[in-house]
Amino acid sequence: LMGAIAAALSREDRLGYIAEQPTYGMLADINAFALGARMVNPYVEVHLEWARRKEAQHTEDILHEKGIHYISGHDMINPDHPSREYGLYRKNEDGTVTNLAMPVWHWGKFYEQIIRLAFKSTEEIEAMKGKKAVNYWWGMSADVIDVICSENMPNGTRRLIEFLKNSIRAGSFHPFDGLIYAQDGSTKCTDRKSTR
């Protein structure tokens, strides 16, 4: 959804994404951002910068110099280096930052799901095999993850995101279903198939 918001608001076909390090979960986040952005604007390009680079220049400044104003940064504020550059934000021409949205994890719901799974009997788990994957990638449909929009978000975009969130929760929209291409043009998921 963060990618969809960025693509809906950007007047350019370039978005920025700042990532910590190339771990499996981080790569999935980057891909999800790009899929969401392409859902709204099929011509958009996501420019990736790694935050842990050795260069002295800030990654936000590198993207800003490329003319990229909408950036998905760190998911949370770092207490050691507080800044306004977190979540999805716009880096304005004068260098100021306008925060737009951020993901929120409901850890209580996550641990509730873990405990429910732990209390299932062996027979129940055996009966679930082949019907339901047992994993810890619970998201919006399990109320573990949400997106909070700031007051800086235009009303039309806010309504679009609420519609998408409600559709995901209701199970009527699956953002990772259907035709998905890799950067090299190869097909990663065919039409009417799911990556879930």
What are these regions (language model features)?
Residues E55-G67:
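Short, well-structured alpha-helical segments in soluble
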Residues M2-V44, L48, K131-N152:
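An alpha-beta-alpha
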Residues R11-L15, N41-V46, E65-Y70, T98, ...:
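Loop/turn elements at helix/coil->beta-strand transitions in domains of secreted/extracellular proteins
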Residues K66-I77, L100-W105, A127:
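Periplasmic-binding protein-like
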Residues K193-T195:
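Conserved small/polar residues in nucleotide/adenosyl-binding loops
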Residues L117-D184, K188-D191:
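A structured, mid-to-C-terminal "fold-capping" secondary-structure block
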Residues H47-E55:
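Short beta->alpha junction loops
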Residues L1-D13, V104-I125:
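Hydrophobic alpha-helical segments within soluble ligand-binding/sensing domains
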